Every structure is written in structure tokens, then in C-alpha cells.
Design a protein with these regions (language model features):
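Short acidic, glycine/serine/threonine-rich helix-capping segments at coil-helix boundaries
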Residues: 138-145, 153-197
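Extracytoplasmic and endomembrane cell-envelope/extracellular-matrix remodeling and assembly machinery
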Residues: 2-3, 7-150, 154-157
């Protein structure tokens, strides 16, 4: 990632002035010269069970699965580790995120927050907006999430201790539930999935 982009990203997180160096982010492990992430293109029939911050592969491995840059050119053949995110499911944009993404999350553990900061930094630096608009996410309240978690646990899809937080564990459990029911296993709670989970 260019220095200006790193500065902008860290500035958005740390509320630094433009002339200051992003020392706070560097202290958290920010790697100069490495971007936070980028939008990518996925092949038809991609196995969405491979998405989520808990699953990391190097760029060579992602390329072997058919992941490409947005212009369909191959990913750079390096051993840089990345995770694949589809924050609004298979119908929305997909992003490969690198270690610097986790640095942004050091300030706020919400994936949506870190993604917003990274995308804002890209736009300020002259980058393009995501190719597809995010799909609207249903508003889920804590009792609904607890109900979903209880349902998943009771049916053999481990969502962890029911806490009402729609985090990566719950999303992974929904992905397994979707796969078992012949659905696209992207972990995204569409109205149809919520109906099956009894949490409309």
C-alpha cells in the first residue's frame, strides 16, 4: 500500500493530522508497503465455506481456487496470506483482506468498521468504489440472534455460547447449515435463511 494510503487509513482510525506519521498503527503491526485488502472476482460455483477471517490462504492458493483481480487478471503469485470476505453474501462484493486489515480491527473489532475504513482510504487515494453495491442486511436484534444461535446449536451446527452477537462463529454455523440444506453457504442471513432458522 502506498505511504499516503497507509497514512490515510491510519489517520481515519487514529484521527491523526495529515502531516503526522502513522506511528500508532505501525505500533499495532501495520506493514508498510502492504495494502489492507482489495476487491476480487470469484468464479461461478465458488465454495463460500472458504470465506471468513478464520480461513487464510496465500495468494497462490486463492488463485488456484479461481479467485482473480477485478479485471480478471491473475493474482500475484506470492505467499502473502489473505482471508476472503463476502460481508453481504454471495450477491455482494468480495474482498481479499491482508494482515493490515487486522490492524484496523485492533481499533474496532467490527468487520464492517475495518472494511469501511479501508474502502474510504482507497477512495481518498483515487481508487474506485466497489463494483457491486452491498446487499441490504436484515436488522437482527439480540433476542433474534440468540434464537438463531440456540436453533443452530440444537441442530448440530455449533454457534458457540448464545450471546446475541452475530459474529464470525454464528456466521460460520449458518454457512454449515446452508451447505447441509443445499443452499449457497455464504453465511449471510437472507430472509429465506432466517425463515428456515425460525427467526423471521
Amino acid at each position: 500500500m502506498p505511504t499516503v494510503m497507509a497514512s490515510v487509513t491510519c489517520g481515519a482510525v487514529c484521527r491523526m493530522r495529515w502531516h503526522q506519521r502513522p506511528t500508532s498503527c505501525v505500533g499495532l503491526g501495520w506493514q508498510r508497503g502492504l495494502r489492507w485488502g482489495r476487491e476480487v472476482s470469484l468464479p461461478e460455483g465458488f465454495d463460500y465455506r472458504q470465506t471468513g477471517l478464520q480461513t487464510k490462504k496465500n495468494l497462490v492458493e486463492w488463485a488456484e481456487l479461481g479467485v482473480t483481480a477485478m479485471d480478471r487478471t491473475p493474482l500475484t503469485a506470492t505467499d502473502i496470506q489473505a482471508a476472503l470476505m463476502v460481508p453481504t453474501g454471495s450477491q455482494g462484493p468480495a474482498f481479499l483482506v491482508y494482515d493490515n486489515f487486522n490492524v484496523i480491527m485492533g481499533w474496532n473489532r467490527a468487520e464492517a468498521y475495518a472494511l469501511s475504513v479501508g474502502l474510504l482510504a482507497d477512495r481518498i487515494a483515487g481508487g474506485a468504489a466497489p463494483s457491486r453495491a452491498p446487499v441490504d442486511s436484515p436488522r437482527l436484534y439480540r433476542p433474534q440472534v440468540i434464537q438463531i444461535q440456540n436453533f443452530l446449536n440444537a441442530n448440530g451446527f455449533d454457534a458457540g455460547t448464545p450471546d446475541g452477537v452475530f459474529g464470525p462463529g454464528t456466521r460460520a454455523a449458518i454457512s454449515r447449515f446452508q451447505h447441509a440444506n443445499g443452499l449457497v453457504a455464504d453465511g449471510f442471513p437472507t430472509p429465506a435463511v432466517l425463515h428456515l432458522l425460525g427467526a423471521e
